[in-house]
Amino acid sequence: MSDSWQTYKDNSEPFSPPENNQWITVEGVIPPNTTPILKRRYISNKCLSTHNTAGGAIYHTPRHQGDDVNISVNPTTGYFKEKIPLQGGGWCQWHINTIVFVIMYTDVNHLIKDAVPYTGTGITIYINDSEKPKEMKKFTNYINYKPIIYPFLRKDYDTPNQIGLYGESGGTTSFGLSLIPGSEWKITYMPTLDETKMPKIIVSENPPGIYPRGNARVEYPDGKIDLNRDSIDYWKINNTSQWE
C-alpha cells in the first residue's frame, strides 16, 4: 500500500479517539510562576512510512503523530488533572506511544530583574513497547514522581539573562510504563521547586581572534566552579553524593 494512499485514508478518517476507550490519568501540582506543557504522541503499525537504504533496499517504519493537550490548572493550588486516551482511532488505528509533561517559568523577575524564562524540566513516559532509552526506571500502571527541581541561570555575554528549570536529568527524566488492561493507569508529577539554590552557567566573551568566542563555566550554590563546560551536574546543586 503506497504512502500516498495511506495519507489519503488518514486524512479522510483522521485521528479521533473513540469514546469507548481506556484512559491514562496525568495529574499533579505545579509550582507558582510556572506553566505546564503536555504532549501526547501516537504510533500506527497499520500506516507505515517507506524508506530506502543506501543500497536501494526498501524498508518500512511505523508512522507517528502527536499534539499538545490543553491543561486546566487551578490558579490557587496549582493542581491539574487530564486524561490521555489509549487509542487514537482513525483509519490508521493510532495508539499511545509516549507522553511528555514539562513545566517552564512564566516569570522570573522575583529571582533576577529583567531576566527572561528559559528551558523547562519534566518527564517523558514511554508506554508499553515503545522504543525507549536503555537506562531508565520502569513501572507498571502507575508512576508517582516527586522530584526536587531548581532554577538555573544562563548568563551569556551576547544575550539577556535567562532562567530555566533543572531536574534530575536536566530536561526531562525518562520512565517506562507498562499498562495492564483493566487496571487504573496514572502518572503523578509533583515537583518541589527549591529557589534557594540556583546554579549558574556563565559564558564570557573571549578576546577578538580567539575561538571559540565564548568561554563557559558552571558556578554552584556552594561556591564550586566547573571550568570549560556549560552543563550542570544535578547532584552538585545540593552538594550531595553523585550516587544518592
Predicted regions and their residues:
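Residues at beta-strand starts and edge strands
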Residues: N20-I24, T34-P36, G78, N97, ...
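Beta-strand-rich domain onsets/edges
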Residues: S4-T25, P32-N33, R40, R229-I232, ...
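A eukaryote-biased signal for long
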Residues: G122-E244
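A structural detector for beta-sheet-dominated domains
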Residues: E27-P31, R41, S72-T76, K83-Q87, ...
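Intrinsically disordered, low-complexity boundary segments flanking structured domains
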Residues: V26-E27, V69, T172-G176
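Structured domain cores in non-transmembrane regions
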Residues: P36-P151
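Short, surface-exposed loop and linker segments with low hydrophobicity and enrichment for Pro/Ser/Thr
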Residues: F15-P17, N21, V29-P31, Q87-N97
